[in-house]
């Protein structure tokens, strides 16, 4: 069963997620960071951008990318359920950029 980390201060994952997943719900930047630090990467991360606090889903995505850089890991699968279109695109761009960097490193290391 895939492990899914749901980041959202408002939405309940059971209202949105279809399928058989082991879901962990976190509602803040601090909870997100603690989950990743304690458990490593899940198989899938679902991001909200606006968390109703100082830190946003984008900050969580930056933490995740830094974690991946430090541990030489690719990003997990991800989705973004935020209604904030600018925040959504910022998260998507950050995550996709790290995936491209990681994939390029793998290719260079093989040569």
Indicate residue ranges for each PLM-predicted region.
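Catalytic phosphate/metal-binding cores of nucleic-acid and nucleotide-processing enzymes, i.e., regions
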Residues: 1-111
